[in-house]
C-alpha cells in the first residue's frame, strides 16, 4: 500500500519513492496562470516524476489541461473531483518538439485589450511552440519600465479595481506575462517609429533582448510562422 505523508507546509508530499510537488491553485481560473505554475514545477522534476495540481472544478480548466497534456506529452495520470475542486496528477514526460510557430502583432495597450493576445501567446509558449511578438502603436508602452495597464475612456481613473479583480483570478499584469513568455523562450520585437512617436526610450525598456525594428524585420518572423495573431 502506498503511504503518503505531508512533510512541510509548502506543498510537497512524500512516499516511499520520493516527493511529489502539490500546487494549490484554487481560486485561479485563468489556465495560463495554472499551467505556468505546473510548467515551473515540472522543470525541477525528472522524467516520470509527478506534480499534483488542485484547481476549481471548472470545465474550461479541465479542457485546457487535457489539451496541454495532449500537446506536450506530459501525462494526466489521475483526475478526480472533490466537491468544488478537481485534483490533477501530472507525470513529466520527455520533451516533445513542436513544429509550430506563433507570430503576433499587438497594437493596443488597454487593460482588457491586452488579455487575449497575451493569453494566446502564453498558451502557445506553454504548449512548446515558438512565439514572437511585435509591439507597435501605443502598445510599445507595454515594454517601458513602470507601465501599468489601464482601461480606455471614462473608466481610466478607476482601472485599479478591475486590475485587482483580474489579478485575483490569475490575470497577472501584462509585464509579468511578458516575463513568463521570455522565460518560456519567446522573442519580443518593438516598432522603432512607434517608440519615437510615443516617447518610449530604448534605454528605459523593462525587458532585455527586445529587437527594435519595423515591418520587414517582423515579416521574416511571420513568413516562417503557421499561427498568426493580430490584436
Each language-model region and where it sits:
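Ordered, small/hydrophobic-rich secondary-structure cores
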Residues: 1-85
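Short, glycine-rich nucleotide/cofactor-binding loops
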Residues: 25-32, 103-115
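Histidine-anchored nucleotide/phosphate-binding helix
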Residues: 38-39, 115-127
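Short internal beta-strands
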Residues: 53-55, 131-137, 189-192
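A glycine-rich helix N-cap at a beta->alpha junction
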Residues: 72-80, 151-182
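Core SAM-dependent methyltransferase catalytic element
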Residues: 87-95
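Positively charged, small/polar-rich N-terminal and surface patches that mediate targeting and assembly
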Residues: 130, 137-138, 142-144, 148-161, ...
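A charged, amphipathic interaction segment
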Residues: 174-230
Amino acid at each position: 500500500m502506498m503511504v503518503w505523508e505531508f512533510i512541510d507546509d509548502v506543498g510537497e508530499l512524500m512516499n516511499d519513492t520520493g516527493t511529489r510537488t502539490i500546487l494549490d491553485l484554487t481560486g485561479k481560473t485563468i489556465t495560463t496562470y495554472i499551467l505556468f505554475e505546473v510548467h515551473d514545477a515540472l522543470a525541477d522534476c525528472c522524467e516520470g516524476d509527478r506534480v499534483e495540481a488542485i484547481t476549481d472544478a471548472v470545465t474550461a480548466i479541465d479542457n485546457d489541461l487535457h489539451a496541454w497534456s495532449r500537446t506536450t506529452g506530459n501525462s494526466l495520470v489521475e483526475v478526480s473531483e472533490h466537491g468544488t475542486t478537481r485534483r490533477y496528477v501530472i507525470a513529466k514526460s520527455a520533451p516533445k518538439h513542436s513544429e509550430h510557430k506563433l507570430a503576433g502583432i499587438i497594437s493596443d495597450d488597454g487593460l482588457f485589450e491586452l488579455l487575449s493576445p497575451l493569453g494566446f501567446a502564453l498558451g502557445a509558449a506553454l504548449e512548446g511552440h515558438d512565439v514572437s511578438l511585435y509591439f507597435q502603436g501605443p502598445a510599445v508602452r507595454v515594454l517601458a519600465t513602470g507601465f501599468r495597464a489601464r482601461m480606455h475612456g471614462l473608466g481610466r481613473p478607476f482601472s485599479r479595481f478591475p486590475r485587482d479583480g483580474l489579478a485575483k483570478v490569475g490575470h497577472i499584469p501584462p509585464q509579468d506575462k511578458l516575463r513568463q513568455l521570455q522565460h518560456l523562450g519567446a522573442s519580443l520585437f518593438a516598432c522603432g517609429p512607434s517608440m519615437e512617436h510615443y516617447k518610449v526610450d530604448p534605454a528605459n525598456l523593462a525587458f532585455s533582448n527586445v529587437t527594435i525594428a519595423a515591418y520587414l524585420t517582423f515579416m521574416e518572423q511571420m513568413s516562417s510562422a503557421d499561427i498568426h495573431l493580430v490584436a
